């Protein structure tokens, strides 16, 4: 019924705007149907889980600050806490312990006595928390006397190689040993995967598909709980806390998803933009990806709404409107006033009003706090995005392939990272200082790298689909081929290298930073992670039947049995 309704609506809109030739994409319909339309939760269950969390939190806190615990065991515990998404519960305690260990212990000497897995865990913990532990801790595993690069005996240590592989995801530019270790461990782990069984097989398979550092936090926490039973069961309080915490979050996220779906129904997107992708459950995943902690409930809802607005704007510019209509829409967005509605085609008017009205609501919420300037920043980001989308549409319309640098300059805008960044500031306005705003406005390397990652990864995964549906599509692949005179396969390889360099820069931006708090950095890194999850192998947003379907099912439909 939903498909028939959308088709009818689309036909009606087409007749209203005459028989124009439109660049229709014919996106696949939502795989969810009305599956999440009637989500309901038992509030008493939330209270039950909350009591368990509070009790086990106290027990685990005592372990984290226990001065008698061996440093390697403590770092292993902190690693499990981090991977289970529980760090926010113990921020001060963990920071205090890591600061003490990093300053008081000679980590190079300590690592000389440890095995590969232990060193890898220690390296990951410090890097993940912003400490620049030297990659030289892995030097003792190098073989400088042969062509093997690494000592042969570690090939038999699958657990150690897996730890090293995960460590390489945290590398920055110039860390040659980690570049070599990445190639070595990836090759070795792929080679032995079919011979493995049990948890280690699941751990290796998942890491090769989605390395932890680049994964969606809530999904990785759930998978860690299942695949790393030994690590999670070492401490009873850790296991019980993780169990209750995941089930608590699942109930909370169901409630939020229901709220976003209802908003989408109230806005009537299926009728006003029937040509656009219907992906609200998938878009909620972006909100969940950027903000995973329970206290960011409103942030997840806001990011989901912004993602929906971005999605329908993208599809309007890319897959429905004519070039003349796009000029009218862009002009209206730049004016940002209700009277501009009159210049728009009938089918565009409802969408334009939704865009304006959502920001009016935001302004009402933030004006009492003196934070309305964040809404202005969001408006500006949408205006820049519209101009970027229009530029791409003009290139397509005129059959022009821009230079790679010209494309990339515009592509950093159409990657949408700036809209998400400004929306994140709205979500965290209570802790955003003037210095932080200045830092954001300076367009630091980590923000540029996140934007580049989004644009290039998107192009790599979607260009074949785009070519099939339209004669003239302009992506970074075509721009690179034209600028440097190389064939498609070479362009793709070079762009993939750029993705890895972008990750190097993102990693560096998280180390020893005094310019901005880790809390404000988190959604930026999480945006890069979401991009990686969505576009690593294909466009999982447009075609969500595999990975995204599995993730949403895992997060919303499969609870963990109570302890």
From Swiss-Prot:
Tissue specificity remark? Highly expressed in leaves. Expressed in roots and flowers.
What does the entry list as the binding residues for (2E,6E)-farnesyl diphosphate? 277, 314, 318, 455, 458
Q: What GO molecular function annotations does the UniProt record carry, in alphabetical order? A: magnesium ion binding; sesquiterpene synthase activity
Per UniProt, where does Mg(2+) 3 bind?
A: 458, 462, 466
User: What EC number is given for this enzyme?
Assistant: 4.2.3.172, 4.2.3.173
Motif window: DDXXD motif: 314-318
Instruction: List the keywords (alphabetical).
Output: Lyase, Magnesium, Metal-binding
Q: How is the cofactor bound?
A: Binds 3 Mg(2+) ions per subunit.
Q: Pathway it acts in?
A: Secondary metabolite biosynthesis; terpenoid biosynthesis
Swiss-Prot/TrEMBL catalytic activity: (2E,6E)-farnesyl diphosphate + H2O = 10-epi-juneol + diphosphate; (2E,6E)-farnesyl diphosphate + H2O = tau-cadinol + diphosphate
Tree of life domain: Eukaryota
Example GO biological process term?
sesquiterpene biosynthetic process
This protein's cofactor list reads: Mg(2+)
Q: Where does Mg(2+) 2 bind?
A: 314, 318
InterPro entries reported for this sequence: Isoprenoid_synthase_dom_sf, Terpene_cyclase-like_1_C, Terpene_cyclase_plant_C1, Terpene_synth_N, Terpene_synth_N_sf, Terpene_synthase-like, Terpene_synthase_metal-bd, Terpenoid_cyclase/PrenylTrfase
Binding residues annotated for Mg(2+) 1, in chain numbering: 314, 318
State the similarity comment.
Belongs to the terpene synthase family.
Purpose of the protein: Sesquiterpene synthase that catalyzes the formation of sesquiterpenes and sesquiterpenoid alcohols. Converts farnesyl diphosphate (FPP) to 10-epi-juneol. Converts FPP to tau-cadinol. 10-epi-juneol is the major product.
What is written about domains in the entry's comments? Answer: The Asp-Asp-Xaa-Xaa-Asp/Glu (DDXXD/E) motif is important for the catalytic activity, presumably through binding to Mg(2+).
Any idea what this protein is called? 10-epi-juneol synthase
């Amino acid at each position: 019924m939903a498909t028939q309704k959308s088709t009818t609506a689309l036909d009606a809109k087409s007749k209203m705007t005459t028989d124009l030739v439109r660049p229709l994409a014919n996106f696949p319909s939502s795989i969810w149907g009305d599956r999440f339309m009637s989500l309901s939760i038992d509030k008493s269950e939330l209270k039950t889980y909350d009591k368990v969390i509070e009790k086990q939190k106290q027990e685990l806190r005592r372990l984290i600050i226990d001065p008698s615990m061996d440093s390697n065991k403590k770092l292993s515990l902190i690693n499990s806490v981090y991977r289970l998404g529980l760090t926010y519960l113990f921020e001060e305690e963990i920071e205090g312990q890591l600061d003490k260990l990093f300053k008081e212990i000679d980590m190079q000497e300590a690592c000389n006595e440890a095995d590969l897995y232990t060193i890898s865990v220690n390296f990951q913990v410090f890097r993940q928390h912003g400490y620049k532990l030297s990659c030289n801790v892995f030097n003792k595993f190098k073989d400088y006397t042969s062509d093997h690069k690494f000592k042969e005996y570690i090939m038999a240590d699958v657990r150690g190689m897996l730890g090293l592989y995960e460590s390489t995801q945290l590398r920055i530019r110039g860390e040659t040993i980690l570049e070599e270790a990445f190639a070595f461990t990836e090759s070795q782990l792929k080679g032995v995967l079919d011979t493995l069984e049990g948890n280690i097989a699941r751990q290796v398979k998942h890491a090769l598909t989605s390395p932890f550092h680049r994964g969606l936090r809530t999904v990785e926490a759930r998978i860690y709980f299942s695949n790393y039973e030994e690590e999670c069961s070492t401490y009873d309080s850790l296991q019980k806390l993780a169990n209750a915490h995941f089930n608590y979050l699942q109930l909370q996220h169901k409630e939020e998803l229901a709220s976003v779906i209802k908003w989408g129904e109230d806005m009537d997107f299926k009728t006003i933009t029937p040509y656009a992708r219907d992906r609200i459950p998938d878009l909620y995943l972006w909100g969940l990806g950027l903000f995973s902690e329970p206290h960011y409930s409103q942030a997840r809802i806001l990011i989901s709404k912004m993602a929906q607005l971005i999605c329908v704007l993208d599809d309007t510019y890319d897959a429905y409107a004519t070039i003349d209509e796009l000029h009218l829409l862009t002009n209206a967005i730049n004016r940002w006033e209700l009277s501009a509605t009159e210049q728009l085609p009938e089918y565009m008017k409802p969408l334009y009003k939704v865009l304006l009205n959502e920001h009016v609501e935001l302004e009402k919420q933030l004006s009492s706090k003196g934070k309305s300037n964040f809404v202005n920043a969001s408006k500006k980001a949408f205006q820049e995005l519209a101009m970027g989308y229009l530029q791409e549409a003009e290139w397509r319309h005129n059959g022009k392939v821009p230079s790679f640098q010209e494309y990339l300059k515009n592509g950093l805008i159409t990657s949408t990272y700036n809209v998400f960044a400004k929306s994140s500031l709205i979500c965290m306005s209570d802790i955003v200082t003037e210095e932080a705003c200045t830092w954001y406005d300076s367009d630091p390397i980590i923000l540029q790298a996140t934007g580049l990652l989004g644009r290039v990864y998107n192009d790599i995964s979607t260009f074949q689909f785009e070519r099939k549906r339209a004669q003239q599509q302009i992506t970074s692949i075509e721009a690179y081929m034209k600028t440097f005179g190389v064939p498609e396969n070479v362009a793709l390889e070079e762009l993939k290298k750029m993705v890895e360099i972008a990750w190097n820069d993102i990693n560096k931006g998280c180390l020893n930073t005094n310019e901005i708090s880790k809390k404000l950095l988190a959604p930026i890194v999480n945006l890069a992670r979401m991009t990686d999850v969505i576009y690593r192998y294909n466009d999982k947003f447009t075609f969500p039947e595999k990975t995204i379907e599995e993730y949403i099912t895992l997060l919303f439909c499969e609870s963990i049995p109570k302890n």
